[in-house]
């Protein structure tokens, strides 16, 4: 009778206690080997989808119909050469380079010590005529540089009364999706933004996880995209840009 009552007690989901409730014994469900096999298969599938899908997700190429090419000035020379080929192979009329102060100089000094200026000179060196190239420097560095560069481009269009309905932006592979997101935020819904990803020739993008540089690039750009997508505040960035500009003006002799 007592054994039957104990079984009934446990079947009802009650715990057994000893030592005045200090020790408790409970029955619980646990995964069987079949259950663990299913969990392992699910984890493996998720991991495979991540490895095979994250790179093409970040390094997206999607051109729009446009006669304006934008080149992020900080990109490496292999990407600059790809931008020159893109310009010469299509019906572009102008190419704009963007970017803030060159890394390592401690902040904005003048427009000619910016990534926009460096990128413009590299485009000319690789064969583009001066008449096609226009640098659009930004004074923003450190935080939200891509958005600051896009805002500087938007302001240049407005100041020069240049109506723009679409652009294509050349940048480096894993930065592309974030570039499109931030340029869209800066330029607004009336401007279609296309992007062109230039692959890093130093590693095989289809097996990026085999290379330390590939792992670093994927995780850093993935985290940066999540920040831009869910945490970035354009109004805060605009206030920071105004502060940088004001400080640069005040520092002039």
Regions found by a protein language model. Give the residues of each.
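Extracytoplasmic/luminal low-complexity segments enriched in Pro/Gly and acidic/polar residues
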Residues: 238-253
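N-terminal type II signal-anchor transmembrane helix
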Residues: 21-60
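A structural signal for short, hydrophobic/glycine-enriched beta-strand patches
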Residues: 56-210
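A transmembrane-helix-recognition feature enriched in membrane-embedded lipid enzymes
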Residues: 211-238
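N-terminal Lys/Arg-rich, disordered targeting/topogenic segments
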Residues: 1-31
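Membrane-helix interfacial "entry" motifs
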Residues: 28-31, 209, 213
């Amino acid at each position: 009778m007592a054994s039957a009552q104990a079984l009934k007690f446990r079947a009802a989901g009650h715990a057994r206690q000893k030592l005045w409730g200090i020790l408790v014994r409970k029955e619980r469900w646990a995964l069987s080997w079949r259950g663990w096999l299913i969990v392992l298969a699910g984890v493996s599938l998720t991991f495979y989808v991540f490895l095979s899908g994250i790179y093409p997700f970040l390094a997206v190429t999607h051109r729009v119909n446009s006669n304006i090419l934008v080149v992020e000035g900080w990109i490496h020379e292999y990407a600059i050469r790809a931008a020159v080929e893109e310009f010469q192979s299509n019906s572009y009329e102008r190419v704009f380079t963007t970017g803030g102060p060159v890394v390592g100089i401690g902040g904005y000094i003048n427009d000619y010590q910016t990534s926009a200026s460096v990128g413009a000179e590299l485009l000319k060196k690789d064969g583009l005529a001066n008449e096609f190239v226009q640098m659009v420097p930004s004074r923003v560095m450190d935080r939200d540089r891509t958005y600051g560069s896009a805002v500087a481009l938007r302001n240049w269009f407005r100041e020069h009364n240049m109506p723009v309905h679409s652009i294509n932006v050349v940048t480096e592979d894993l930065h592309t999706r974030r570039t499109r997101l931030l340029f869209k935020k800066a330029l607004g819904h009336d401007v279609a933004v296309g992007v062109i990803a230039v692959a890093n020739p130093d590693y095989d993008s289809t097996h990026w996880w085999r290379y330390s540089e590939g792992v670093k690039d994927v995780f850093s750009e993935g985290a940066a995209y999540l920040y831009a997508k869910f945490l970035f505040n354009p109004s805060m960035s605009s206030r920071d840009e105004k502060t940088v500009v004001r400080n640069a003006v005040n520092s002039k002799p």
